[in-house]
């Protein structure tokens, strides 16, 4: 599944983006999945829930991915 998420601000944090894309149900779920090293941003494992995502960034979680767009 590939999804685009739109954000109005300059950036969106990784945990928020995962929730907005529907890949996790809560912030707690996002935190656990990110800390487990199961999320990649632009092809690299990311373990910071507060990582700022900008338009063009691609996030993947176990075969699902989304792209941040303005």
Regions found by a protein language model. Give the residues of each.
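Short, charged beta-turn/beta-strand-edge "cap" motif at the junction between a beta-strand
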Residues: 63-68
């Amino acid at each position: 599944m590939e999804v685009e998420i739109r954000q109005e601000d300059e950036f969106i944090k990784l945990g928020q983006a995962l929730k907005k894309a529907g890949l996790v149900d809560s912030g707690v779920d996002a935190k656990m999945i990110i800390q487990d090293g199961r999320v990649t941003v632009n092809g690299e494992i990311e373990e910071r829930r507060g990582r700022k995502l900008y338009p063009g960034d691609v996030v993947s979680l176990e075969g699902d991915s989304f792209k941040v767009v303005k």
